[in-house]
From Swiss-Prot:
Alphabetical GO biological process terms: rRNA base methylation
Enzyme class: transferase
Cellular component GO terms, alphabetical: cytoplasm
Protein known as: Ribosomal RNA small subunit methyltransferase H
Main location per the UniProt record: cytoplasm
Catalyzed chemical reaction(s): cytidine(1402) in 16S rRNA + S-adenosyl-L-methionine = N(4)-methylcytidine(1402) in 16S rRNA + S-adenosyl-L-homocysteine + H(+)
Source organism (scientific name): Beijerinckia indica subsp. indica (strain ATCC 9039 / DSM 1715 / NCIMB 8712)
Localization in the cell: Cytoplasm
Role summary: Specifically methylates the N4 position of cytidine in position 1402 (C1402) of 16S rRNA.
Protein EC: 2.1.1.199
Family statement drawn from the similarity comment of this UniProt entry: Belongs to the methyltransferase superfamily. RsmH family.
CDD domains in the cross-refs: AdoMet_MTases
SUPFAM superfamilies on file: Putative methyltransferase TM0872, insert domain (SSF81799), S-adenosyl-L-methionine-dependent methyltransferases (SSF53335)
HAMAP family: 16SrRNA_methyltr_H (MF_01007)
Length: 355
């Protein structure tokens, strides 16, 4: 579980292991846990959803996380579970390999809680937050280029595209130009250094979100390839769910939600023509998911009052049919990657590929 996403306001909790899992009851209801079922928590985080699943009668849980600190913190819970919990380190795009290594062929339910966790935001040394002083890192695992590497080496065009497409930042060109100018004299090494530059060149208006919010989101997504990971993970989850199994996904911003919404729409047949194909035309693939109830499910005002970070959360879920899994949804790849061609100004960037 990667609980409590949204803005960076304080969380009403007593430490990392007690971070509030967003939409906890709604997630459990959507999973419709059955006695003795096998479930996958694809984003363990502080373990909130895993704890909720283990509270159900005789359930078994495989929980994974790409952050080794989250796995290390969860070992005590694993030891207390009497063999009902298995923790594994890895990206959720590789969940098929992880499940195979653990000898689990299929699941009754899979839950994703997408994005950065409160644990990561609340540790300045991880470099995710602009609220404190920390290294400009943002990696969910220690390998690969950091945010500082990206900020200090990418050209102005690429930085502007990252900020616009992954952060929906309309001042992307102005911010990118300022970064390239400043780094020629002093490389960026800390979160505060970058946040102060952004606030200087794009101060925003009173009452707006912090000026650095969208840029930090964009860098985090780029560093961790979060949207591409999500596209791959949804296809992997489809293949691992047995008939009647539930796929439940909680998102915290429009880029994630759009991918999940379009995946479930495509796999459920929503929006497809209902008429029979003409002779010679390929038949429509049978739906792999049924979408029950009204969606998305949103947090209640009461939950938002207790945990303000929940306010941007959306829950979508699907019920797996007996139809064969279709594999990677190639139509979602443009939503998860930068375009091949860029536009000269952020104000003229086309949003057509995001619709």
């Amino acid at each position: 579980m990667k609980s409590g996403r949204g803005d960076e306001s304080p969380l009403a909790a007593g430490g990392p292991a007690r971070h509030v899992p967003v939409l906890r009851e709604e997630v459990v209801a959507a999973l419709d846990c059955k006695k003795g079922g096998f479930y996958l928590d694809a984003t363990f985080g502080a373990g909130g959803y895993t704890r909720a699943l283990l509270a159900e009668p005789e359930t078994h849980v495989l929980a994974i996380d790409r952050d080794p600190e989250a796995i290390a913190a969860g070992r005590a819970l694993e030891a207390e579970s009497a063999g009902r919990l298995i923790l594994a380190h890895g990206r959720f795009s590789t969940l098929a390999d992880i499940a195979a290594a653990e000898g689990i062929p299929a699941f009754d339910g899979i839950v994703f809680d997408i994005g950065v966790s409160s644990m990561q935001l609340d540790q300045p040394e991880r470099g995710f937050s602009f609220r404190g002083e920390g290294p400009l890192d943002m990696r969910m695992e220690s390998r690969g280029p950091s945010a500082a590497d990206l900020v200090n080496t990418a050209d102005e065009q690429r930085l502007a595209d990252i900020f616009y497409y992954f952060g929906e930042e309309r001042a992307s060109r102005r911010i990118a130009r300022a970064i390239v100018t400043d780094r020629a004299h002093t490389p960026f090494t800390t979160t505060r250094q970058l946040a102060e530059l952004i606030a200087r060149v794009n101060p925003g208006k009173p009452g707006d979100i912090h000026p650095a919010t969208r840029v930090f989101q964009a860098l985090r997504i780029a560093v961790n390839e979060e949207l591409l990971e999500l596209v791959r993970a949804l296809a992997a989850a489809e293949a691992l769910l047995r008939e009647g199994g539930r796929l439940v996904v909680v998102t915290f911003h429009s880029l994630e939600d759009r991918i999940v919404k379009q995946f479930l729409a495509a796999r459920s047949g929503r929006g497809q023509a209902v008429s029979r194909p003409l002779p010679g035309e390929p038949a429509l693939a049978p739906p792999t998911f049924i979408l029950p109830g009204k969606q998305p499910v949103l947090p209640s005002p009461e939950e938002i009052a207790v945990n303000p970070r929940a306010r941007s959360a959306k829950l979508r879920f699907g019920l797996r049919t007996a139809a064969p899994a279709r594999g990677l949804e190639s139509g979602l790849l443009p939503l998860a990657t930068l375009p091949e061609t860029s536009h000269p100004k952020s104000a003229s960037h086309s949003k057509s590929r995001r619709r």
